[in-house]
C-alpha cells in the first residue's frame, strides 16, 4: 500500500513518498 511508510520509502524515497501519500492516501 502507498500509505505504508516502508513501501513509500521503497517506491521513491522521501520526495516520492510525500507525493504518493497526498495522491493515494488523500
UniProtKB/Swiss-Prot annotation:
Entry keyword set: Alpha-amylase inhibitor, Secreted
Localization (cell): Secreted
This protein's GO CC annotations: extracellular region
Keyword Secreted in record: yes
GO molecular function: alpha-amylase inhibitor activity
Principal location: secreted
Family: Belongs to the protease inhibitor I6 (cereal trypsin/alpha-amylase inhibitor) family.
Role, per record: Alpha-amylase inhibitor.
Protein name, per record: Alpha-amylase inhibitor 1
Amino acid at each position: 500500500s502507498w500509505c505504508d511508510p516502508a513501501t513509500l520509502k521503497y517506491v521513491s524515497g522521501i520526495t516520492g513518498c510525500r507525493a504518493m501519500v497526498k495522491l493515494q492516501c488523500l
